[in-house]
Amino acid sequence: MSRKMPAHLRKLGQGLAPDAAAGAPAEQLREPLAASVRFRLSVPATSANLGPGYDTLGLALEWRDEIEVSAAPRRDPEKPAVHVVVDGEGADQLPTDASHLVITAVERILAAKGYWLPDLQVNAQNAIPHSRGLGSSAAAITTAVLTAHQLVPGGLSAEEQLQIGSRIEGHPDNYVPALRGSVAVSWQAADTPEPLFKTAPLTPHPEVTCVLAVPNSVQSTQAARDLLPVSVPHEQAAKNSSRAALLVHAITTEPALLLDATEDYLHQEYRRQAFPASMALVDQLRGAGYAAVISGAGPAVLVLTEASRAASCAELMGRFAAETGFDDTFSPKSLPIARTGATVEVLR
């Protein structure tokens, strides 16, 4: 049974993937499921930029949202039955109906492939803090893409998963490590009529680990972006290029260079007014020899360090955080890089 594709979904579906609607009637949606399915997803937090790798470098953290999805063919062909249960982060803030980001993204992907949204029950145990620069929205988009992969007959190819999620998210620096794990360099190919994203994996040095300082304050990604200048001096750009190149070497081969490699000249200083306490903590940690940066759009602080220094870093981080002179409070947390990205376990 099929029905007309709503206009807003036709628009949202445009450009998701070059072959998104191949083989499907342009104005028809149909049921994707022949029987009910149930599966469990585990999606890691992420940290993007890593200092000089603005909108390019990102890594996955072993700190995960756990989601269970039950899907069944629609009982009512005119409207799906959708229910979302959220525990943990965002439990008192996130919608529990079809307006939830995961549901709207799944609906968007399915519509682009020619299918309607089936009946869905989503139970989310959220651990990733929201609006802290730790990839909570990328985790939601990853959940949506992998849910769609389970629902679409034949699934989504690895390339479709890369392009669809990156286009919905807008940039791949958080999304790619959430999907695939580890550390990644991602970029947008030039001279393409539609956004075309590419990525290359990096294997981090076995001694590299992470320490986070998670503040009680939140930060809008868009508000942080709005503070950036239209252009920067050529000298600053050149310095940043050298540090970004060095960071690839440091994080994979020579961790002793991480402090120099994480110097940023493109975004952090311009955003200082948005999270002064976080920047003060970054300054103190870097002054003590730790490779501290703002995680993503902030305000969380990330330190890339050798495992042997992680405990002392967390201790120092807690002491420095109490001395910033600001009202913000920070919770130190040591986390390894997640070598595995999002996982899916089919339950039936």
Where does each model-flagged region fall?
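ATP-binding N-lobe of GHMP and related small-molecule kinases
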Residues: S2-R132, G154, I337-T340, L347-R348
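Gly/Ser-rich oxyanion-binding loop with an adjacent helix/lid
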Residues: L9-A21, P25, W116-L196
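Glycine-rich, charge-dense phosphate/pyrophosphate-binding loop(s)
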Residues: G13, P25, L29, A250-R348
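A generic local secondary-structure boundary/capping motif
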Residues: L29-E31, D55-G58, S166-I168, P172-V176, ...
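Glycine-rich beta-alpha junction loops
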Residues: W63, S182, V214-Q219, Y265-L266, ...
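Short beta-strand-to-loop capping motifs
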Residues: Q188, P215, V303-A307
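Acyltransferase
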Residues: H205-A288
